[in-house]
């Protein structure tokens, strides 16, 4: 996997397929490899050259000392786009990756042709706030947590029927049962970024100044970014499109990759 040193941090990335460039930004604690079992193959088949990368704090990218901010992550993504010489390009992100893309759309419109914000563009819920504090404080403990900590947290998002599906559970375990200890500087850094972001009350002002085309994708059963909150953001971003996918949780890109990819490709075909 190639890498680039941006903002003093080595960021590991990969390029898939050929066509118009599209950068995918990962969620918190999510490895770039996870795109491979969700929407990445579908976007490549649709004719995009897809760039994936591991955020700072996620191996094999560097994990500088905590804390981080979402602005740090967005600056890394912007610098990677500049390093690759692909801007302005389309960007899409899930969860924390959605926050990164939101900042890129607002602050670096010179690099962004259009942005898809998946399960993350919304006024913060009380659940998001307390969840972020819990994650940060857990990551700061001077103890070694099980390597399965991340996957056990993720599985709680899924409906009971999905947890009873051995193939689905095995897939999540293979992706998110970390090879490195759960408690590490990168994990703490990313959770610290989540705390700052979820307690930021200035989002509506940022939404109002976004000038690039934006798609917000929400999932019916998402407790982090519930549809009623996502619709508030969609109404506040000038000209934003909104798609809601039924029957999915916060992990919608893994549950219904076809529907998510269709929403993105339909939107990007117009922008």
Model-derived features: where do they sit?
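Short beta-strand/loop motif that positions the catalytic acidic residue
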Residues: 210, 216-218
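Conserved alpha/beta-hydrolase catalytic His-Asp/Glu region
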Residues: 148-201, 206
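Flexible "cap/lid" loop of the alpha/beta hydrolase fold
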Residues: 106, 114-144
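Conserved alpha/beta-hydrolase "acid-adjacent" motif
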Residues: 223-229
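Catalytic active-site module of serine/aspartate enzymes centered on a nucleophile-bearing elbow/loop
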Residues: 240-271
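Short glycine-enriched nucleophile-adjacent loop
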Residues: 98-109, 115
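Active-site loop/oxyanion-hole signature of alpha/beta-hydrolase fold enzymes
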Residues: 52, 56-92, 262
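Conserved HGGG/HGGXW glycine-rich cap/lid loop of the alpha/beta-hydrolase fold
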Residues: 6-62
